[in-house]
Amino acid sequence: MSNITILDEATANKIAAGEVVERPVSVVKELVENSLDAGANRISVELTQGGITGIKVVDNGYGMPAEDVQLCFLRHATSKIKRAEDLNSILTLGFRGEALPSIAAVSKVTLTTRTEDELAGTTMQIEGGYMQNVVPTGCPVGTIIEIKDLFFNTPARRKFLKTANAETSQVSDLITRLAMARPDVRFELRSGNRVLFSSPGTGSLKDTAAVIFGLDNVRSMLEIGYQGKLLSVAGLISKPVLTRASRHYQNFFINGRYIRSGFLSSILQQAYDTLIPAGRFPIAILHIDIDPTQVDVNVHPTKMEIRMAREGEIQEELLAALSDSLNVPTAITGLWEIMPGRTKNTATDQRAENLEVKPDSKEKELQPKESQHPRLVACDLPSGKIMPPRHDQEQLHFSSRRIAPVRGKNSLLPDEGSSINREEIPPVVDVKEQQLKENPNTYQPAETLGFPVLVPAGQVPPTYVLAHGEGGLYIIDQHAAHERVLYEKYLYLLGNYVEAQMLLEPLTLEIPHHEAQLIIKHIVDFNELGFILEHFGGDTFLLRGVPTNAITEPKEVFLDLLARLQENPSQKVEKNLVLDHLAAAMACRDAVKSGQHFSAVETKALLDGLARCQKPYTCPHGRPTLIQISQEELKKRFKR
């Protein structure tokens, strides 16, 4: 007796549906892409319980004739291609004929459609892959498709779905990307009676981007337009001053299709090399048109991944297009933090004065004009703010409010109520504890044992500092070294006392819906970390308070944390990890950048600060801060 069984069609369809239909967002993607292929310029998506119990998509496309209504639910039935050769030049979003039968196999579907040539439309109902009835009906031109009880007949799949809010967030993220792909189409996303997202549909990418990212961010973006031999590029890319902590805000569209591509993301990052710090990523909306014969979209069931021929030439042209847009004066506006003038009446200000960056000239004076040159952030100051706001920003006003101490593995202070033998604690801990009580911003660590005593010897523009010591010659990465110094200072301060600075004028945050749900879920956790938030209705929040040491760019720091939280699969606010990221983000932003020229005083201050770090040999991102060339290696190289 044969052990091989030919599965019936219904069972085969349920299995095949697993490749195409993973969750509600998969259904929405397939249905909306069908609407776009049908020429619709108005598409409405309505969710019930995040799409788990209901999805309704309405479009004003050209609809389907009555004879095609039943055919569209047959597997591999499609109007997009006729033969295999058509795959070489496919421009539609769908083409396999798998989506509708896969959706129908695991849900209850009602399809209503009419073409312009027909007097009456057609309604068809399918349940679990089996047709229930087909009747004529009155309806406008276009298509209405309703999906109910997704995975009702496959409970194993249904139990792995997330909460309604989580599923809604995924759909919201998809719709915003589709709106960027087609700014000429008006998209609307609703959950119950609430409108979550609505794009203008004016055809302007800037208008659409302003709705998604906010008008202020769009003003900090550059338009890109390029026509080459192999491809054309259009879209928006952020100025180097506008970055995020993840690649989530990078959007690539090949021939109108949204894709995920590490290849394209690496090219984008290469274009920003030396313009933004490591670990920071630009925002981008890039529409790339390529000869369809050079692109294979038939790679993955979701069609989110593609293959491209002639990748080397594509990389060369795309990099040229991006570099041309970034090599304009307006592209780097605001890249440097400039010290505004202020009264210098404290020891902190006087010591900061000695660390002012010297311009690249033959002048011996160490006092450049503050309006012309960036200032090196003091790396060993015992107190004071790091990097005040830029001169072109509004001055923020604060009032203090103490937040309960946040303690974790990075805390240098004992837990309250713990039993302590004072004789076992080195004196330096008692000193630090006393300093911290008197002035929470005080931080002056002891020198690290084993770290070489370095004597400054000069600078190798634009990035490196030379020094010599017992071990030979040392080459220091100025940005990485300063980043490590600031990171340990910030981590110390945040790990012991989180003090919130209350803004007299709160900052308004307009957040995409899927991120707004995370804020609502974790708003108490954020408050404990010093980010005092108030839900202002819809997807708008008021940022009323920020951690003391994050006041230079509080909005950017908070959005970075939100991006990291979104990347975390568990989407839990783990305080130690958040504090670590907050310290690293502030250090990366405030550290000196490549190209700053140091005086001898500034170089000595940087090396002294590095010597006091607990882990002076790498920056927070794991890059080395310095390398050593031993005396033996030098003698060998010089044949001695």
Curated annotation (Swiss-Prot):
InterPro entries: DNA_mismatch_repair_CS, DNA_mismatch_repair_MutL, DNA_mismatch_S5_2-like, HATPase_C_sf, MutL/Mlh/PMS, MutL/Mlh/Pms-like, MutL_C, MutL_C_dimsub
Annotated Gene3D superfamilies: 3.30.230.10, Histidine kinase-like ATPase, C-terminal domain, MutL, C-terminal domain, dimerisation subdomain, MutL, C-terminal domain, regulatory subdomain
Compositional bias segments (type: Basic and acidic residues): 350-373
This protein's UniProt keywords: DNA damage, DNA repair
Gene Ontology molecular function: any one: ATP binding
GO biological process: mismatch repair
GO CC list: mismatch repair complex
Pfam families registered for this protein in UniProt: DNA_mis_repair, HATPase_c_3, MutL_C
SUPFAM superfamilies for the chain: ATPase domain of HSP90 chaperone/DNA topoisomerase II/histidine kinase (SSF55874), DNA mismatch repair protein MutL (SSF118116), Ribosomal protein S5 domain 2-like (SSF54211)
Stretches for region Disordered: 343-389
PANTHER family: DNA MISMATCH REPAIR PROTEIN MLH, PMS, MUTL, DNA MISMATCH REPAIR PROTEIN MLH1
NCBIfam families, per the entry: mutl
Family label: Belongs to the DNA mismatch repair MutL/HexB family.
Role this protein plays: This protein is involved in the repair of mismatches in DNA. It is required for dam-dependent methyl-directed DNA mismatch repair. May act as a 'molecular matchmaker', a protein that promotes the formation of a stable complex between two or more DNA-binding proteins in an ATP-dependent manner without itself being part of a final effector complex.
Name by which UniProt lists this protein: DNA mismatch repair protein MutL
Organism for this UniProt entry: Desulforamulus reducens (strain ATCC BAA-1160 / DSM 100696 / MI-1)
Gene that produces this protein: mutL
